[in-house]
């Protein structure tokens, strides 16, 4: 039972690859692994020690140096991916339709079963690149909104009579999530950015880019 709870906690803290990477790194540190900077000279690699490093904030490479010669003991490799099918939010994503309904322009990431995403509460997670005092070294901030924000809604059946017969879904039209409703022009184009600023306690002018899902 403890293993199941641990797995569920890991999944809850790792909705996208960036957050999964952070969670894995913390677990490695807790297990006695040492973090390496892959851009620096590695001169402390010795038998019996264990290390890890990351790439692009989205993948982790961990290894343990054995005490036996490599030619005699060989080595073991275990690989897994930490991303999963989802929807990636495009830049300038807000699309305002009739009645002020705001949807987010997204692209399908991976191979999701589209029908399973309808009529359920969804949220946003990923990373935001933020301006720092050093123009050449922006800061990466991880974002995980732990409350419902979005929904991909089915049409009522009298607007889609064939829904129970199997309807082909358009990835460009039918699965764009609804973010909210705006009441005036001042809100237009700012809902998502304002949400990011509120969650991360940053200024809009400092946002350089984001990878959000």
Show which residues each predicted segment covers.
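N-terminal hydrophobic/helix-forming segments and targeting peptides
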Residues: 1-213
């Amino acid at each position: 039972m403890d293993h199941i709870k641990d797995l569920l906690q890991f999944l809850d803290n790792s909705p996208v690859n960036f957050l999964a990477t952070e969670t894995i790194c913390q677990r490695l540190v807790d297990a006695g692994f040492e973090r390496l900077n892959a851009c620096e000279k590695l001169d402390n690699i010795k038998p019996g020690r264990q290390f890890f490093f990351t790439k692009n904030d989205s993948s982790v490479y961990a290894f343990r140096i054995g005490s036996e010669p490599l030619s005699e003991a060989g080595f073991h490799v275990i690989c897994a991916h930490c991303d999963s099918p989802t929807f990636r939010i495009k830049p300038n994503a807000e699309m305002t339709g009739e009645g002020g309904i705001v949807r987010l322009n997204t692209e399908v990431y991976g191979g999701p079963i589209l029908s399973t995403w309808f009529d359920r509460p969804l949220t946003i997670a990923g990373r935001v690149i933020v301006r720092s005092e050093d123009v050449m070294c922006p800061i990466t901030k991880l974002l995980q909104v732990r409350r419902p924000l979005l929904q991909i809604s089915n049409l009522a059946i009298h607007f889609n009579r064939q829904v129970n017969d199997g309807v082909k879904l358009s990835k460009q039209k039918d699965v764009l999530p609804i973010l909210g409703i705006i009441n005036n022009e001042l809100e237009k184009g700012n809902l998502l950015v304002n949400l990011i600023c509120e969650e991360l306690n940053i200024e809009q002018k400092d946002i350089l880019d984001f990878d959000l899902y």
